[in-house]
Regions:
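Active-site beta-loop-alpha junctions enriched in small/polar residues
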Residues: 29-31, 57-59, 80, 131-133, ...
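Anionic-ligand binding region
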Residues: 87-119
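Short glycine-enriched, charge-decorated loop/helix-capping segments at active-site entrances
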Residues: 2-3, 89-94, 172-181
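Conserved Radical SAM active-site core
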Residues: 1-74, 84
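Short, conserved beta-strand edge motifs with alternating hydrophobic and charged residues
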Residues: 53-55, 76-79, 100, 127-131, ...
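Alpha-helix-loop-beta-strand connector modules within alpha/beta enzyme cores
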Residues: 39-53, 99-110, 182-193
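Non-cysteine beta-strand/loop elements that form the S-adenosyl-L-methionine
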Residues: 69-84, 156-163
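Auxiliary Fe-S-binding modules of radical SAM enzymes
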Residues: 112-204
Length: 204
């Protein structure tokens, strides 16, 4: 990597747009929100028109999200864990579930449900991702029910099946319960749980 100032980042955004990129995707930007805001303001002032995607773990500070209101078009958060104990054990962040709920509420307040243009590309709204983990069907079900009840039954959901045990998880018996890939049955059950909750818009 290399250090860039706000103008240089804005230049890159505009260059990507000129090359035909469909959006400007900011991946895991939670720790550099002030710099993101400065760069976006510069790029928009210079004509940036592509949708801005905020791609996040959902472990975001509310103040940071509120400062992005009007700058971000598409929020793409993960919702990883429902239980504090699971978040503490696997992510060392026991407050993740409530932080994610607060963050996703704020994201939806700003941009609403995901909407598409005539070209079939997403233009504005919320897209929530959930990574299916082995043995965590009940947590997935709780997440989906909350999304349907508290955010919107029209929430666009990406149920992701690509979990792989790596690094310590793959070698250390402390994480034995997640030291395997989810089964096809677990993935199917995640989709079924989402449908039972009332969700119906899925990324495939």
């Amino acid at each position: 990597g290399r250090k860039l100032d706000a103008r240089e980042i804005a230049n890159l955004m505009l260059e990507l747009e000129d090359r035909g990129c469909h959006n400007i995707n900011l991946v895991t930007p939670e720790h550099v929100v002030p710099q993101v805001i400065e760069a976006l303001a510069e790029a928009i002032a210079r004509g940036l028109a592509s949708p801005v995607v905020y791609n996040t773990s959902a472990y975001d500070a509310l103040d940071s999200l509120r400062s992005l209101d009007g700058l971000v078009d598409i929020y793409m958060p993960d919702f990883k864990f429902w239980e504090r104990a699971t978040a503490r054990r696997l992510a060392k962040a026991k407050d993740y579930p409530e932080r994610a709920r607060e963050a996703i509420r704020e994201m939806h307040r700003q941009v609403g449900d995901l909407r598409f243009g005539p070209d079939g590309l997403a233009r504005r709204g919320l897209l929530v991702r959930h990574l299916v983990m082995p043995g965590q069907t009940a947590e997935a079900e709780a997440i989906f029910q909350w999304l349907a009840d508290e955010i919107s039954p029209d929430t666009f959901l990406n149920v992701m099946a690509q979990y792989r045990p790596e690094h310590q998880v793959g070698r250390d018996r402390r994480y034995e319960e997640v030291a395997r890939r989810p089964t096809a049955a677990e993935i199917d059950e995640a989709y079924a749980a989402a449908r039972r909750a009332g969700l119906w818009r899925f990324a495939r």
